């Protein structure tokens, strides 16, 4: 069977589902006292809300926070921060609020919003597709919210590995692709320059210094494939 990637697989599920709400959830998540009604209530609290994400905590150790919303992406570095990341959950993020981006590990989406916005973009295959999709929702006039009354526990990158060539390839290639699709004017060229001159150089030196030639090769292939509009690295 063909591997359609994160977006392709989710799009098949979205098209097959019949309900008013679409709950998109990673296969490496764990539920403990899961309260999905809180997500539904938040989603229905305003016609402007298109996506709601729960609080996400890591499924190991003391279950530190992984996600309590996101900060906006930098126009130059194409970086942002997950609010609360790595912090002990002491109840400091118990107020629901709008957030620029949904988290791909868990999100509840209005079907009517998807029908207006469109399906997940297929060009990423893995990583960054939820950020792009979030931007599509925002451009269509929808809000994305973080709802702390519901919590999901995430094992994080068990399927791909934190330092695998697969992950390195798609992270590298898709950063550029996100800029290509969503940035304009001077910001696009500043971001390209930063990714080429700073990020690619830094990562290349780091991989070479530690002898991670497979990661260096994957990163270089990611850059080349972006430049030639290709996708070639789909094995683990």
Predicted features and spans:
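Acidic metal-phosphate-binding loop of nucleotide-sugar-dependent transferases
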Residues: 4, 29-30, 56, 124
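Short, flexible, basic/aromatic active-site loop/helix in glycosyltransferases
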Residues: 72-100
